[in-house]
Amino acid sequence: MRRGRVWLAALCLAAGAAHADAIDTLKGFVAEVKTGRAAFTQTVTSPDGAKKKSSSGSFEFSRPNRFRFAYTKPYEQLIVSDGQKVWLHDPDLNQVTVRPVGQALGATPAALLAGASLEKDFELKALPDDGGLQWAQALPRVKEGSFQSLKVGFRGKTLAAVEIVDAFGQRSRLEFSQFEADAKLPADRFGFTPPAGADVIAQ
């Protein structure tokens, strides 16, 4: 009986260490990886799990608060931040929406991935390993109502996935591939000039 308890205690300690590693990995990612780029696939699932929509594209970031999400399939859309403003360009509508970066980010997934003040904006919680990934949950300290939960998955020290549940229960999962840490990214990757004739909406 004693051996069984010792084995169980050792198992619990090992699990606790793994969970701590997930938080340490997330902290290390934010503190040490100043730039990065990857391909991504995004799957959005309805609250009842019945409907799924998929899209794909590329993601680049340069801390603090500069990032570029370029959706290419099934249709093009660009979200880019130069550190001061966030631009959303929808080519099909020929429409651009622009917001100040502080207003647009707050405690959002983009702020988590490209920001620099992790523990100021988020409360961190270790989650069990799942699907071969180490997971850490990040809960916004200021409840803004845009999403219920956010978790980040790592394979080793490499960013592998982000899963978001929004305020309506809709689940979005981004899976990253070909991640390159500390990539050399030119500053103009995070600049944006609205196309001629585009309808620009400032918020």
Swiss-Prot record:
Main location per the UniProt record: periplasm
Keyword Transferase found: no
Residues in the signal sequence: 1-20
One Pfam family this sequence matches: LolA
One BP term from GO: lipoprotein localization to outer membrane
SUPFAM superfamilies for the chain: Prokaryotic lipoproteins and lipoprotein localization factors
Protein localization: Periplasm
A GO CC annotation given for this chain: periplasmic space
Keywords: Chaperone, Periplasm, Protein transport, Signal, Transport
Keyword Ion transport in record: no
Superkingdom of this protein's organism: Bacteria
Family of the protein in this entry: Belongs to the LolA family.
Role played: Participates in the translocation of lipoproteins from the inner membrane to the outer membrane. Only forms a complex with a lipoprotein if the residue after the N-terminal Cys is not an aspartate (The Asp acts as a targeting signal to indicate that the lipoprotein should stay in the inner membrane).
Assembly behavior: Monomer.
PANTHER family referenced in this protein's UniProt entry, alphabetically: OUTER-MEMBRANE LIPOPROTEIN CARRIER PROTEIN
Protein name as annotated: Outer-membrane lipoprotein carrier protein
Taxonomic source organism: Methylibium petroleiphilum (strain ATCC BAA-1232 / LMG 22953 / PM1)
